[in-house]
Amino acid sequence: MAKHVAVLMGGWSSEREVSLRSGAACAGALEAAGYRVTRVDVGRDVAEVLTHLKPDVAFNVLHGQPGEDGTIQGILEILRIPYSHSGVLASALAMDKAQARIMLAAAGVPVAKGGLVSRAEAAKAHIMPTPYVLKPNAGGSSVGVFIVREDQAHPPQELTREDWPHGENLLAEEFIPGLELTCAVMGDKVLDVIEIESTQKFYDYESKYAPGGSQHILPARILPEIYQRVQMLSLTAHRALGCRGVSRSDFRFDPSRGDGSGLICLEVNTQPGMTETSLVPELAAHAGISFGELVTWMVEDASLER
């Protein structure tokens, strides 16, 4: 009998729409591969829904809270339902960008200069030399991210909104000019490196998910030694945070820095996008792994105590 796979998608984070698109793509591919699939638009009754469904595997395609921060992983552990991607601890660490920075730096993965600040601090005055980047400490898909440039006399006024939806803790980091690079890890296998050219000022939400929002250059147009270093650092980051299944690490590379400090890891994504414009499926395809083979591998890799 075919395995029953519950594809967890949607949820209530700011990345809900992207998750629904990822979930639809994955569910369709899993059905084509012969699995019995139930699409679950995750609500706060998810534990009750999954208890009733009794799936063999939960395929987690949620982005943001609660699917990327360890919450859904903890529920699945309690219900004893094997699941895809990373476990409770790795998910929580990667979602907390400030904590992830500490872990990555300790493992030898270079991170940008910066640190955690409150929204109130960030809204009052520049908290570091411009240009710098402000981003929610527990956000994703570049939602709520600002580049504070040299010609800006004051921090972004959006930070003073009473209905600010992205939490009270922000990560402030120096802005690294240059190339946007990304690399994925699949189990213990590191994939290739993509160079991203955005039509926007930076690789924001629209660039990531709107057709034509960015151009993906694969393989990236960088020197072989930099290419291999990105791959090595991606695998190191995956292991340092204790990731499982598939992860994607994002980097900036400034070729003008000749002292070796030009390659910086921005973050590790434990729930990378799986839409038609997403990077991980593209990297897998470049390695000869079809989308159907990728999602099948993720189902068969699912387990508990990840």
Curated annotation (Swiss-Prot):
<feature type="domain" description="ATP-grasp">
    <location>
        <begin position="101"/>
        <end position="300"/>
    </location>
</feature>
<dbReference type="GO" id="GO:0046872">
    <property type="term" value="F:metal ion binding"/>
</dbReference>
<dbReference type="InterPro" id="IPR013815">
    <property type="entry name" value="ATP_grasp_subdomain_1"/>
</dbReference>
<feature type="binding site">
    <location>
        <begin position="128"/>
        <end position="182"/>
    </location>
    <ligand>
        <name>ATP</name>
    </ligand>
</feature>
<keyword id="KW-0067">ATP-binding</keyword>
<dbReference type="GO" id="GO:0071555">
    <property type="term" value="P:cell wall organization"/>
</dbReference>
<keyword id="KW-0961">Cell wall biogenesis/degradation</keyword>
<comment type="similarity">
    <text>Belongs to the D-alanine--D-alanine ligase family.</text>
</comment>
<feature type="binding site">
    <location>
        <position position="267"/>
    </location>
    <ligand>
        <name>Mg(2+) 1</name>
    </ligand>
</feature>
<dbReference type="GO" id="GO:0008360">
    <property type="term" value="P:regulation of cell shape"/>
</dbReference>
<dbReference type="GO" id="GO:0005737">
    <property type="term" value="C:cytoplasm"/>
</dbReference>
<keyword id="KW-0464">Manganese</keyword>
<keyword id="KW-0963">Cytoplasm</keyword>
<dbReference type="InterPro" id="IPR005905">
    <property type="entry name" value="D_ala_D_ala"/>
</dbReference>
<dbReference type="InterPro" id="IPR011095">
    <property type="entry name" value="Dala_Dala_lig_C"/>
</dbReference>
<protein>
    <recommendedName>
        <fullName>D-alanine--D-alanine ligase</fullName>
        <ecNumber>6.3.2.4</ecNumber>
    </recommendedName>
</protein>
<feature type="binding site">
    <location>
        <position position="250"/>
    </location>
    <ligand>
        <name>Mg(2+) 1</name>
    </ligand>
</feature>
<keyword id="KW-0547">Nucleotide-binding</keyword>
<feature type="binding site">
    <location>
        <position position="267"/>
    </location>
    <ligand>
        <name>Mg(2+) 2</name>
    </ligand>
</feature>
<dbReference type="InterPro" id="IPR000291">
    <property type="entry name" value="D-Ala_lig_Van_CS"/>
</dbReference>
<keyword id="KW-0573">Peptidoglycan synthesis</keyword>
<keyword id="KW-0436">Ligase</keyword>
<dbReference type="GO" id="GO:0008716">
    <property type="term" value="F:D-alanine-D-alanine ligase activity"/>
</dbReference>
<keyword id="KW-0133">Cell shape</keyword>
<dbReference type="Pfam" id="PF07478">
    <property type="entry name" value="Dala_Dala_lig_C"/>
</dbReference>
<dbReference type="GO" id="GO:0009252">
    <property type="term" value="P:peptidoglycan biosynthetic process"/>
</dbReference>
<feature type="binding site">
    <location>
        <position position="269"/>
    </location>
    <ligand>
        <name>Mg(2+) 2</name>
    </ligand>
</feature>
<comment type="pathway">
    <text>Cell wall biogenesis; peptidoglycan biosynthesis.</text>
</comment>
<keyword id="KW-0479">Metal-binding</keyword>
<dbReference type="InterPro" id="IPR011127">
    <property type="entry name" value="Dala_Dala_lig_N"/>
</dbReference>
<dbReference type="Pfam" id="PF01820">
    <property type="entry name" value="Dala_Dala_lig_N"/>
</dbReference>
<dbReference type="InterPro" id="IPR011761">
    <property type="entry name" value="ATP-grasp"/>
</dbReference>
<comment type="function">
    <text>Cell wall formation.</text>
</comment>
<dbReference type="InterPro" id="IPR016185">
    <property type="entry name" value="PreATP-grasp_dom_sf"/>
</dbReference>
<keyword id="KW-0460">Magnesium</keyword>
<dbReference type="GO" id="GO:0005524">
    <property type="term" value="F:ATP binding"/>
</dbReference>
